[in-house]
Regions:
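Conserved catalytic or regulatory cores that recognize and/or transform ribose-phosphate-containing ligands
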Residues: 3, 8-216
Length: 216
């Protein structure tokens, strides 16, 4: 490594990059999909993230939630992760998850709250082959009811394999980020026409409906 003298150290600067906080929400039966999302995000950060000066940070309850007394578990997750997230990826396999105070499951509550906040929502349903012994008919009924509720809103995609899920997530996140960064640059340029002293925001609110560019 290189040792810098005081004069040289004074010139070292770290680049500030917009950060997209991406929440991962799912029941416990889609662990493979969570791993895929993390790999896709790593690839994005190493490719277009570097060229476009943006960093995607994934947030997942098992890694990013600290114990907190006095509140319901879902309220803690909402406070520590959801309220700070710019977008959410939700995945359903064969389970719908544990119920909360107000919704059928924690994942459904997180989807609903992000929609209410006007944030970006990506929802994926697995159609991968399943053993009969793993099928939960009650959960399946609830999942189908949830899909029926949102079918006209175009907020979800069905995938049939891990490879297809990987391709969907990579495509949707890439287009989402590039579109939002382009929109942010346009917003900044529009403002600077009237005020040359304005500085670009450190973080970008990433809100975009990917169904506008992808035909589900």
């Amino acid at each position: 490594f290189v040792i810098l003298n005081k004069k040289q150290r004074g010139k070292v600067m770290f680049k500030k990059m917009p950060v997209c906080r991406l929440m991962i929400s799912c029941p416990s039966d889609v662990k493979t999909e969570v791993e895929i999302i993390n790999r896709v995000v790593d690839n994005i950060n190493d490719s277009i993230g570097i060229s476009m000066d943006i960093f995607v940070k994934t947030l997942y309850w098992s890694k990013n939630v600290m114990p907190e007394a006095g509140n319901y578990p879902q309220s803690i997750i909402n406070k520590q992760i959801l309220d700070k997230s710019d977008a959410i990826i939700a995945i359903f396999g064969n389970r719908i998850g544990s119920p909360t105070q107000h919704y059928e499951s924690g994942t459904i509550e997180e989807i609903e709250l992000m929609i209410q906040k006007g944030k970006q929502v990506f929802v994926y349903f697995s159609d991968k082959p399943v053993r009969k012994s793993e099928i939960d008919m009650e959960a399946e009924t609830k999942i189908q009811a949830f899909k029926e509720k949102y079918k006209d809103r175009g907020i979800y995609v069905v995938y049939a394999s891990d490879e297809e899920f990987n391709d969907y997530v990579s495509m949707h996140l890439t287009r989402y980020l590039t579109t939002e960064l382009a929109n942010e640059v346009n917003r900044v340029n529009e403002h600077t026409r009237f005020d040359d002293s304005i500085s670009q925001r450190k973080e970008v609110d990433l809100i975009y409906d990917y169904t506008k560019f992808y035909d589900i």
